[in-house]
Amino acid sequence: MIINNNKLAELSSQRVNGLGGLSIHFKDGRSRISRLYQEGAAKIRMPQVGGDPLEAILINTSGGLTGGDRLQWDVELGENASAVITTQACERIYRSGGGEARIATRLKAAKGTRLAWLPQETILFNQSVLSRTLDVELEEGAEILVVEATIFGRLAMGERVDEAMFSDRWRVRLGGRPDGRLVHAEEFRLGPDIGAELQARPVADAACAVATVLLISGEAGKHLEAARQIIGEEGGASLWQVGPATKLMMRLHAPDSYTLRKRLGPLLALLNGKAGLPKVWTF
């Protein structure tokens, strides 16, 4: 038997490329889809809900990402629309054979809108490489709730992350334009010795599960004390006024994903009001 190594190399170099786009407008008393775009591994499904907010579930059909893979989500809300966006499952970032996996999210919200970006956790495996970016453009009067949770190895499965590269970049701007006023920025980087870096108290205090939650809303202040009660000693919450934007910033850490989710779930349910948690979130 003769094996064509060139063909094997071609197959091994195939990469995941996914792009999903969703535009939502408010018409006839409720939020409705005005545009839906799916390409490659990115799929979007809408479960039945009894009214606003519209709920959308993002799916990566590849089952995970590794070096060289690309996944992008674009969500835009028209005036007075509301939506909750989540993922079907945790995103998995596998060992890289070269290059980085990239996840890019772009959110736009017009005035009078409320957008909740609530993906399930991202799980990093040993020797994985991930670059994650989040770009948000808000018109004045728009509200947004954002969470990004990251798990460094599943301890219950005997997995550890000693070496990996992870970067997480956020930019949130007012004015509904890419050059609008910057009201929030994150620039978080770990690696290559992630296992050792996570031990440091200012980083994660030996935690293997972390989450960042951001609420920008005129009513953010009323949730401060309740959020602190839920978060407890393993994390914190702070309130700022940046121009016309009131933002509540929260961080949580835990020894494992289950312990993190036991606090993260109630926190998101509190902050997301009547919409609560997406249906696909389980405990």
Swiss-Prot record:
- Claim: Hydrolase is one of the keywords in the record: no
Q: Which UniProt keywords apply?
A: Chaperone, Cytoplasm, Nickel insertion
Q: Which GO terms describe its cellular component?
A: cytoplasm
**Where found?**
Cytoplasm
Q: Name one GO molecular function term.
A: nickel cation binding
Quaternary state and partners of this protein? UreD, UreF and UreG form a complex that acts as a GTP-hydrolysis-dependent molecular chaperone, activating the urease apoprotein by helping to assemble the nickel containing metallocenter of UreC. The UreE protein probably delivers the nickel.
Q: Which PANTHER family match?
A: UREASE ACCESSORY PROTEIN D
> What biological function has been recorded for the protein in this entry?
Required for maturation of urease via the functional incorporation of the urease nickel metallocenter.
User: What family classification does the UniProt entry report for this protein?
Assistant: Belongs to the UreD family.
What is this protein called in UniProt?
Urease accessory protein UreD 1
Q: Which organism is it from?
A: Brucella anthropi (strain ATCC 49188 / DSM 6882 / CCUG 24695 / JCM 21032 / LMG 3331 / NBRC 15819 / NCTC 12168 / Alc 37) (Ochrobactrum anthropi)
